[in-house]
Amino acid sequence: MGSGISSESKESAKRSKELEKKLQEDAERDARTVKLLLLGAGESGKSTIVKQMKIIHKNGYSEQECMEFKAVIYSNTLQSILAIVKAMTTLGIDYVNPRSAEDQRQLYAMANTLEDGGMTPQLAEVIKRLWRDPGIQACFERASEYQLNDSAAYYLNDLDRITASGYVPNEQDVLHSRVKTTGIIETQFSFKDLHFRMFDVGGQRSERKKWIHCFEGVTCIIFCAALSAYDMVLVEDEEVNRMHESLHLFNSICNHKYFSTTSIVLFLNKKDIFQEKVTKVHLSICFPEYTGPNTFEDAGNYIKNQFLDLNLKKEDKEIYSHMTCATDTQNVKFVFDAVTDIIIKENLKDCGLF
């Protein structure tokens, strides 16, 4: 009988040891898990950062996956030319080519009959001719006066390639494609011995109430703000400047009680578009008090300081900022490497090892 008790207690001890080991493994895994929250206003580049994580850390997009973006790319291209054509009327700009009025009529007719994401050779030719019209180009130059996708020029300048038969989208085409994020999208990947769980949350105002569910246990927030949005208004409220909205949102996040111990990284995104725009449109359109030179460095630093100055706990909390171009894989790779080092450093600090 004694031996029975002995074998039972051996079994119990074995089970206890296994459970301890599992708890230890779980604790180690949890310690290595980084919960990253991507926040920012609509169209600030959050979803493009997520696509880059797939390219950099998850073997990229297969040909089959790239093909799945073809309909989105065609839809983006068609929506872009339609937006420019409609703005021609609103802004009172005339076509230069006598044929363009007929092309506009055909564009509307084909757009109404075509299923979303389709592209016929006839439609491709109509779009190409319209895009070449100097009136359309003049209207495109005034894109901040109406709503136009950032990817418009990328696709419209490359119509021969993207409308050719047998076209397979490449990773750059995928990165430039735009689908409004609704709800919360999670991406998981490993890097530098850490397990990342990245959450991309819709940026439009209607999507923001869903953010609250993600707040618990967040290691780091990456806040995306589009530098190039300083002369643009919101899709959902044309009275509100996009940069002002972004600053307002950043203020509420960086000073929120939920995030008092959370690392915050600011991605000042779309630096490529900003660099081009700042030579034509003065920053004072958004910040009337700005009297500095309208250069990339000066105007960019001024915007950066507008964000960083909102941090009410400067002594205790550092906000790390980077100028980014979310469609540039090498730039994102370099910046994310730096972000990961910040996370590791902050984790060591929390453990008292730094």
UniProtKB/Swiss-Prot annotation:
GTP binds at residues 40-47, 175-181, 200-204, 269-272, 326. Keywords: Cytoplasm, GTP-binding, Lipoprotein, Magnesium, Metal-binding, Myristate, Nucleotide-binding, Transducer. Potential N-myristoylation may anchor alpha-subunit to the inner surface of plasma membrane. It comes from the Eukaryota. Residues 8-27 have a biased composition (Basic and acidic residues). Coiled coil: none annotated. One of its GO terms (molecular function) is G-protein beta/gamma-subunit complex binding. One of its GO terms (biological process) is adenylate cyclase-modulating G protein-coupled receptor signaling pathway. Mg(2+) binds at residues 47, 181. Residues 173-181 are annotated as: G2 motif. Belongs to the G-alpha family. G(i/o/t/z) subfamily. This is Guanine nucleotide-binding protein G(t) subunit alpha-3. The gene is GNAT3.
